[in-house]
Amino acid sequence: METSQPHNAESMSQDLSELLKEATKEVHEQAENTPFMKNFQKGQVSLHEFKLVTASLYFIYSALEEEIERNKDNPVYAPVYFPMELHRKAALEKDLEYFYGSNWRAEIPCPEATQKYVERLHVVGKKHPELLVAHAYTRYLGDLSGGQVLKKIAQKALQLPSTGEGLAFFTFDGVSNATKFKQLYRSRMNALEMDHATKKRVLEEAKKAFLLNIQVFEALQKLVSKSQENGHAVQPKAELRTRSVNKSHENSPAAGKESERTSRMQADMLTTSPLVRWLLALGFIATTVAVGLFAM
């Protein structure tokens, strides 16, 4: 017992970014050993699952960024406040409008697990702002690190436009050099004044962020599985609306290209195993976190 306290103190003297990496190592290894981590690279992902995940991300980032704005002048968060470079809400809004149409807010689902994640973010922002950095770091640097790779895979797998529609989430226009920006972010985060007890709480909150993500994935999987048990694929209202619009304009040149793209997407959904498709869709989000934490 006499040697444990000095060792613990020495450990807590490490940079916060390194402590976060070590604290989340186990959950990272678990993610690495799941089937989707390898299969994802094959680009086997369907449009519908991708849309569901994007919708949940919108609710999560809306809550996260609301609390960041609340605490932007608070010394426990202000040094890592980079809204122009990192914030994702506006980008997700663009993606959702592309996928669901102008009425997307009425179309997207918010599962109970997603709402639980949202509620935790609000509790942290309002009552424990010193823990907000745990959520920001695991999300933003993960998205930034893995974003470009995932963008290319999604673009090819879903046959999305080369101009980037539907992929705004993965595009960080405010970051010209990702490596240098991550170095800046880590240095700012490591400079946050934080005692040992607070550091421990931040590390626990980072692990909790991973668990909340997993719960969201499980909830979305149940949503899809329930539909499959009923013997039909989930049909979002927006997809039905798109078909109706396309039918009324089927003779236009633009409609021809859109019809061809839609057909390819539907073929992709039919030829890929439902289980594999879902695991891969979850991989988009889990991979961004894992890559972000362990590729720096």
Swiss-Prot record:
Modifications after synthesis and translation: A soluble form arises by proteolytic removal of the membrane anchor.
An MF annotation (GO) of this entry: metal ion binding
One GO term describing the cellular component: endoplasmic reticulum membrane
Entry EC no(s): 1.14.14.18
Known regulation of activity: Inhibited by metalloporphyrins in the following order of decreasing potency: tin mesoporphyrin > tin protoporphyrin > zinc protoporphyrin > manganese protoporphyrin > cobalt protoporphyrin.
Keywords (A to Z) from UniProt: Endoplasmic reticulum, Heme, Iron, Membrane, Metal-binding, Oxidoreductase, Transmembrane, Transmembrane helix
One Gene Ontology term from the biological process aspect of the record: negative regulation of ferroptosis
Subcellular location: Endoplasmic reticulum membrane
Site residues, Important for catalytic activity: 143
Transmembrane residue ranges: 274-296
Summary of pH dependence: Optimum pH is 7.4.
Catalyses which reaction(s): heme b + 3 reduced [NADPH--hemoprotein reductase] + 3 O2 = biliverdin IXalpha + CO + Fe(2+) + 3 oxidized [NADPH--hemoprotein reductase] + 3 H2O + H(+)
Ranges facing Cytoplasmic side: 1-273
Binding-site residues for heme b, renumbered to this chain: 21, 28, 137, 186
A Pfam short name: Heme_oxygenase
SUPFAM superfamilies cross-referenced by the UniProt entry: Heme oxygenase-like
Biased amino acid composition, Basic and acidic residues: 238-250
Membrane topology category: Single-pass type IV membrane protein
Family: Belongs to the heme oxygenase family.
Subunit structure, as described in the record: Homodimer and higher order homooligomer. Oligomerization is crucial for its stability and function in the endoplasmic reticulum.
Name by which UniProt lists this protein: Heme oxygenase 1
